Amino acid sequence: MRVLFAAAECAPMVKVGGMGDVVGSLPPALAQLGHDVRLIMPGYGKLWSSLDIPAEPIWRAQTMGTEFAVFETRHPTNGLPLYLVGHPVFDPERIYGGEDEDWRFTFFASAAAEFSWNVWKPQVLHCHDWHTGMIPVWMHQDPEISTVFTIHNLKYQGPWRWKLDRITWCPWYMQGDHTMAAALLYADRVNAVSPTYAQEIRTSEYGEKLEGLLNYISGKLRGILNGIDLEAWNPATDKALPATFSSANLAGKATCKQVLQERMGLTLNPDTFLLGMVSRLVDQKGVDLLLQVADRLLAYTDTQIVVLGTGDRGLESGLWQLASRHPGRVAVFLTYDDALSRLIYAGSDAFLMPSRFEPCGISQLYAMRYGCVPVVRKVGGLVDTVPPHDPRQKSGTGFCFDRFEPVDFYTALVRAWEAFRHPESWKELQRRGMEQDYSWARSALEYDRMYRDVCGLKEPSPDAAAVEQFSQGQEADPSRHGGASQTLSPSEEAPIESSEASSGSTPVRTSRNPLARLLGKQRR
């Protein structure tokens, strides 16, 4: 099946949040199931230098009264075809923000739609978050292209200053004025990034004023849990670590803890309970809750805290003040550093995620993979991925609390600290977390089912059936599934521009999209 991912981020080239990880890791897992998966994203100024293969122009066109070019290259890590929408509006280093943010991403969405109609026509166009929210609206009138829309974070619904009442028929939409609502209405299928979050967003507590609409479309809404790349995130082979380790041999983790304490200026003590946090420093992540309990925790327990991230100035200031009150025990690094984040996962004893809401969360998966026990609030994807530790049953992988209250968070931290004081049972807890399977292979099977459902196909793709049989302990039948990979026949291949398009004679075409023409305006 031909699948085109359209997104504002894609790791490792452009990553601001978890969406970048998903768009960078899910496509190769789908390709393993036999799908022809490609990606299209804005050609940001900072992106071009990260490419291993130079991007070549293959097509030029106009949309919304503005000319653009599409460049083709390959993803630097998974090798899948990558298309970049080139226009000066994407040249600045910034990814988000700015007064023209709504125009930029609507323009990108329209360009991606034009590309799908004119250059490479997918069977499924998979859109991610509000930045691509108008694509399902435009594709709604094309019976040959099905759309899937993934909600990574419902809170960010997209600024919108144009009057959409002239292009949408649904009265529900009139209550909103953003692209997220349009996508929810017009996408053929909608999914959230965890089963629990898919249920939560249908309530007033987590629905961000869209719970009525989400209940209205509940028949096409589902939750599919995110995964992680188990090869890229493997403490046994991670070259960024001073020492490697595994669930069978945890010795290297002590070395990582020592190096982390040295690098962050903490007092060297292997027996101190070291808490790590790698996060955007925003309201969602519960950093304010940490600030409310940290002084008391440090006063009554032998604990150290390491925080890595950037975000809200007020939260950054609060963390700096906390570190100044507790030199040698609290370290704050206000940036994002991939190598340091891996060292924090590897060197910390426990990982903090006291989130107000959490669509899925990937950090807790990285933490468990690196033997770092998560302390989380029971919300969203954290419910689906971190079963609570039960010392009597010797089950669970982390410490959980219910209410977003300082006393609940503090109690969970004290329970974790007390468990840490029993080394043997703590190692068992670490091993259980490290041995969890949150690979993309499982998630890819769910997406495969959704793709086939939306396209009206009853049988799973050949490789998907083989993988599912294998995961259930059955022997796959090569004769039934067509071997290890699926190759589309020439008749199934979507038309693509001839090679002359990349030789410099790139044609300019006007929009085939009536809605884009309706909205078409020159940038102000």
Swiss-Prot record:
Residues 463-524 are annotated as: Disordered. ADP-alpha-D-glucose binds at residue 15. Gene3D superfamilies: Glycogen Phosphorylase B. It comes from the Bacteria. Residues 489-505 have a biased composition (Low complexity). Transmembrane segments: none annotated. It holds the Pfam family Glycos_transf_1. It catalyses: [(1->4)-alpha-D-glucosyl](n) + ADP-alpha-D-glucose = [(1->4)-alpha-D-glucosyl](n+1) + ADP + H(+). InterPro entries: Glyco_trans_1 (IPR001296), GS/SS (IPR011835), Starch_synth_cat_dom (IPR013534). SUPFAM superfamilies: UDP-Glycosyltransferase/glycogen phosphorylase (SSF53756). Pathway: Glycan biosynthesis; glycogen biosynthesis. Keywords: Glycogen biosynthesis, Glycosyltransferase, Transferase. Its EC number is 2.4.1.21. One of its GO terms (biological process) is glycogen biosynthetic process. GO terms for molecular function: alpha-1,4-glucan glucosyltransferase (ADP-glucose donor) activity; alpha-1,4-glucan glucosyltransferase (UDP-glucose donor) activity. Coiled coil: none annotated. NCBIfam families: glgA, PRK00654.1-3. Synthesizes alpha-1,4-glucan chains using ADP-glucose. HAMAP family: Glycogen_synth. Belongs to the glycosyltransferase 1 family. Bacterial/plant glycogen synthase subfamily. This is Glycogen synthase. It comes from Synechococcus sp. (strain WH7803).
